Structures are given as C-alpha cells and as structure tokens.
Amino acid sequence: MTAPADTVHPAGQPDYVAQVATVPFRLGRPEELPGTLDELRAAVSARAGEAVRGLNRPGARTDLAALLAATERTRAALAPVGAGPVGDDPSESEANRDNDLAFGIVRTRGPVAELLVDAALAALAGILEVAVDRGSDLEDAAWQRFIGGFDALLGWLADPHSAPRPATVPGAGPAGPPVHQDALRRWVRGHHVFMVLAQGCALATACLRDSAARGDLPGAEASAAAAEALMRGCQGALLYAGDANREQYNEQIRPTLMPPVAPPKMSGLHWRDHEVLIKELAGSRDAWEWLSAQGSERPATFRAALAETYDSHIGVCGHFVGDQSPSLLAAQGSTRSAVGVIGQFRKIRLSALPEQPATQQGEPS
C-alpha cells in the first residue's frame, strides 16, 4: 500500500518514499517518552492493551493474511491521537530532519507513548502487506524475532511491570521473483520498524535505570526483558531492510543516501530515535551492573543481543559494499571502511554493559 494521491507530504520529502511506503509515517518526539514504569502504565497501557487484544483475537494468528487483517481492524478501532506535525522544533538537528524526510517520517504533537503504539501498528501493517503479497527471504529465526519485536513492544506497553510474553508468529513464505523497487520498499519499511523498536528499546532502558535506582528488582527484570526482545527486533529490522543483493543496493538504495537525492553526509547515526537509544544505553551501565549483582542473567543476554545486532549490521554492510569500501561518513581522503566504522561503534556500545554477571567476577553471591 502506498500513500493516497491527495496526501500532503512535507516539503523536501523525496518522491520515491510515497512510491514504496504509506507515508507520512507519524512518530512522536523520543525525548518526551516516559521514564518510569508507573508513568508508562498511566500513559499508554490502556491503548496498548487494546492493540494486544486486537492482534490476538481468535484466528488472528492462523497466517499472515489473518494477522494483517487483524492489524488493520485494530488500527481502525483505535481513537485517533496526535495533533498535527510538531513544526519548528529546537530539539531537532538539521541531520535529524534530513533523515526523517528521507523516510517520510513526520514528528507529531501529542501523547508520545500512544503515538508509539500507533506507529508500531502502522509499521507492522507495512511489513505484513509485503509479506502477504511477496513473501520474505529472511531466515525463520530472524523473521520470528522481527515480528516478535512488535508483540514484545505492545505487550510490555500494556503491562510494563511484567516481562513481555512471546506470541505465535505466522511464518512467511519464500520471496517471489523481484519486482520494481522491491529492495527500496523493504529498505524504507524496515527503517520504519527500526525507529519504532529503537524508541521502545530506549524507553525500556530508561525504565530499567529508574527501577534499578529504586531497587525494584521485578521492575528492572521486566524492563530488561523488554529491552532484550526489542533489541532482537531491531536486529531483524536491520536484516529485513538490508535484504537486497549488491546490484539492487547500488541501483535502488545507495542513490537515496547520496547527493543530489540526499544531503551530504546523511547517515542513520543521525536518526533522532537512534540518538536517544544510544544516550540511554550510554547511561545504563550502573543499572545493568546492579541487575547483574542480583544474580540476573538479563545483562548477559542483552549484551549478546546487542552484539549480534551489530554483527548483523556489519554483515549487511559488508554484503553491500565489501569490508574495505569507505563509509559514506568518512572524511574526504579517508580510507576507513564502513564495516570498520560499525565495528568501532560496536566496541563502544558494548563497553556500557558488564561483560559477565558480577557474581562470576569474584563478588559475593
């Protein structure tokens, strides 16, 4: 499904976006997300609960077509939220704005957590539309994590004090022969999913930090479990967005990342939602160490999820451009490879997490 002909898009949005996705794709300002489990429950649990019930009504999980129909019915049943575009926003950098325009994302005024529920349903519908029509070449485990990320997000938002419970994910059939803009369609829609799950993971990490600071072990465990499932979903989103061969990448995707289509140096590093997630991760070490000291395995399993997400990103990048090609972000004349840049970020991000449970490092159990 693409945008209706009468839809008004922001000035500067590239023409290709509306050809491959339903836009505008509305998201709130991630800086306004709640920071505690109690705030989260008050802000969004009722709406998220409606979404969970809608996606799990009898028969909704029999196959992807049934899940798509349930998703669309659920979206239609929810009362509208949001009060139009944010407009001028002092918290938005020029690079943030460039990235939003490139993917048809419109920052919307209104209750940010409820907007996240709606964005999750919109992103899920976008993926299911393609899968019902075209199938998917994602391996089954990646597909389960990818779609399972939506269930984890909505389930946790509905009951923030409990770890999200997995739901049945119908499998996707193998992808059919390529059609026009197939790769670009997955690229744009996969990025919509990534931004939704990145907001969710940032939110879960913030709630983990607050719970740990208050000594709330059940709350910290629930938040950590949500963060792990959402990071696994982010991994699936990266693999889905990068499901293209090198020819498709060079012909359909790379031109959208470079002038004249894109501003110079546009990069996913400047996604507003990614920036907020990275900020939360950078400040989370004490919380993960506290949780580890309580004997929890969540810090180790989240660390593994984060590492594997970066490994998948490295794999996608290497598949597209090889392990020696310079990054689009590289300074003029630099020979630093794109794969090397991602690997360095992997090292930095993992340094925010304890390497193993504290009780295994000689601390009292």
UniProtKB/Swiss-Prot annotation:
Cofactor: heme
Activity at various pH: Optimum pH is 9.0.
EC number, as in UniProt: 1.11.2.5
Single GO term (MF): oxidoreductase activity
Catalytic activity: 3-methyl-L-tyrosine + H2O2 = 5-hydroxy-3-methyl-L-tyrosine + H2O
Lineage: superkingdom: Bacteria
Disulfide bridge positions per record: none
Example of a GO biological process term: antibiotic biosynthetic process
Residues annotated for heme binding in this entry: 313-317
Result for mutant: residue 191 to A: Does not affect heme-binding
Keywords: Antibiotic biosynthesis, Heme, Iron, Metal-binding, Oxidoreductase
Cofactor note: Binds 1 heme group per subunit.
Pathway membership, UniProt: Antibiotic biosynthesis
Described function: Heme-containing peroxygenase that mediates the hydroxylation of 3-methyl-L-tyrosine (3-Me-Tyr) into 3-hydroxy-5-methyl-L-tyrosine (3-OH-5-Me-Tyr) in biosynthesis of saframycin A, a potent antitumor antibiotic that belongs to the tetrahydroisoquinoline family. Involved in biosynthesis of 3-hydroxy-5-methyl-O-methyltyrosine (3-OH-5-Me-OMe-Tyr), a core structure of saframycin A.
Designated name of the protein: 3-methyl-L-tyrosine peroxygenase
Natural source organism: Streptomyces lavendulae
Origin organism lineage: Bacteria, Bacillati, Actinomycetota, Actinomycetes, Kitasatosporales
Gene for this chain: sfmD
